[in-house]
Design a protein with these regions (language model features):
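C-terminal structured subdomain/cap of oxidoreductase catalytic cores
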Residues: 97-104, 108
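C-terminal cap/loop subdomain of S1 sulfatases and analogous C-terminal strand-loop tails that border
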Residues: 2-82, 86, 120-121
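Bilobed periplasmic-binding protein-like "clamshell/Venus-flytrap" ligand-binding domains
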Residues: 111-125
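Intrinsically disordered, low-complexity polar regions and short flexible loop motifs
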Residues: 89
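Amphipathic alpha-helical surface "interface" segments used
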Residues: 31-32, 126-129
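Carboxylate-dense, calcium-coordinating segments in secreted/extracellular and ER-lumen proteins
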Residues: 92-96
């Protein structure tokens, strides 16, 4: 479940009609303490950069800019599509994009379909305040 699912879940709770063309799923049963089903995939965003989580995999698209900042914190800027198995590699140290290209291409296609024109390779780093 993701925060964008609050809309459909709360809509169900109050008996509202939720449009079918929005990305929100009804998880009211989960809110009420019953076991629910998680999303299989989701697009995540941090400081204007997107990534895609599907099952055990994380797909990080290429972005322009420095790989790390002055404190050596990685910024998610790579010059190629990267794929990680989060179940086996939580630190995202082993890029599997060349090892399992069929998974990379499938997730890349799903990511691009989900994000449409929102994915841009040239994102300026936002200053955290």
């Amino acid at each position: 479940m993701a925060q964008l699912d609050f809309f459909a879940s709360l809509g169900h709770l109050v008996g509202g009609n939720v449009p079918e063309n929005i990305d929100s799923r009804d998880h009211l049963d989960t809110f009420l303490g019953n076991k629910g089903e998680a999303r299989e995939s989701i697009v995540l965003e941090a400081q204007g950069r997107l990534c895609y989580r599907s099952g055990d995999y994380a797909l990080i698209p290429p972005y322009k800019g420095p790989v790390a900042n002055i404190t050596k914190n990685e910024l998610g800027n790579l010059d190629h599509w990267s794929l990680f198995n989060l179940k086996e590699d939580r630190g995202q140290l082993n890029d599997l994009s060349a090892t399992i290209p069929e998974v990379l291409e499938e997730l890349k296609s799903d990511f691009l379909a989900a994000t449409g024109t929102f994915y841009k390779t040239d994102v300026k780093e936002e200053e955290l305040k």
